[in-house]
UniProtKB/Swiss-Prot annotation:
Pfam families in alphabetical order: Ribosomal_S17e (PF00833)
Family listed: Belongs to the eukaryotic ribosomal protein eS17 family.
Top-level taxon of origin: Archaea
Originating organism: Methanosarcina acetivorans (strain ATCC 35395 / DSM 2834 / JCM 12185 / C2A)
InterPro entries: Ribosomal_eS17, Ribosomal_eS17_CS, Ribosomal_eS17_sf
Molecular functions (GO terms): structural constituent of ribosome
Protein name: Small ribosomal subunit protein eS17
Gene3D superfamilies per the UniProt record, alphabetical: Ribosomal protein S17e-like
Gene name per UniProt: rps17e
GO cellular component terms attached to this protein's record: cytosol; ribonucleoprotein complex; ribosome
Keywords per UniProt: Ribonucleoprotein, Ribosomal protein
Annotated GO biological process: translation
């Protein structure tokens, strides 16, 4: 079974992918820095969850 993400994490991730989708990669560390750059998220936990969700979505988009 997979993890269930909160709505605010999904909404933020989809917004980032819609606006800056071409700069995100399959690398979590790179995406973590980009999430910090493009958002005002102060919480480390929320930032990491958004970066992880973006990483998974980018990896799935590249496969198909």
């Amino acid at each position: 079974m997979g993890n269930i993400r909160e709505t605010n994490i999904k909404r933020t991730a989809f917004s980032l992918l819609e606006n800056y989708g071409d700069v995100f990669t399959k690398d979590f560390e790179t995406n973590k820095a980009l999430v910090t750059k493009y958002t005002t998220i102060e919480s480390k936990i929320i930032r990491n969850r958004v970066a992880g969700y973006v990483t998974r979505k980018v990896a799935r988009m590249k496969v198909y």
